[in-house]
Amino acid sequence: MVNVKKGVLVTSDPAFRQLLIHLDDSRQLGSKFIVRELDDTHLFIEKEIVPMLENKVEQIMENMNPEAVDK
């Protein structure tokens, strides 16, 4: 049997990859979104989650360094 999913290949440094894994494990976006962990710098994630993931990462970055955010 073959399963097919539309997804996006994400390339990142290992630290950001760990952040994505944490968001996935804690289901902070409502559900798990990582389809497959490929290696230390690549993840395959569900395509539909990308806009929500971008917003969540932007929110995290703003909270970490509010002065660096363009207003």
Curated annotation (Swiss-Prot):
Its main location: nucleus. Coiled coil: none annotated. GO terms for cellular component: chromosome; transcription factor TFIIH core complex; transcription factor TFIIH holo complex. GO terms for biological process: nucleotide-excision repair; nucleotide-excision repair, preincision complex assembly; transcription by RNA polymerase II; transcription initiation at RNA polymerase II promoter. Keywords: Chromosome, DNA damage, DNA repair, Nucleus, Transcription, Transcription regulation. It is found in: Nucleus; Chromosome. Disruption phenotype: Auxin-induced degradation of the protein causes no obvious phenotype in germ cells and early embryos. SUPFAM superfamilies: TFB5-like. Pfam families: Tfb5. InterPro entries: TFB5-like_sf, TFIIH_TTDA/Tfb5. Component of the 7-subunit TFIIH core complex. Belongs to the TFB5 family. Component of the general transcription and DNA repair factor IIH (TFIIH) core complex, which is involved in general and transcription-coupled nucleotide excision repair (NER) of damaged DNA and in RNA transcription by RNA polymerase II. In NER, TFIIH acts by opening DNA around the lesion to allow the excision of the damaged oligonucleotide and its replacement by a new DNA fragment. In transcription, TFIIH has an essential role in transcription initiation. When the pre-initiation complex (PIC) has been established, TFIIH is required for promoter opening and promoter escape. This is General transcription and DNA repair factor IIH subunit TFB5. It comes from Caenorhabditis elegans.
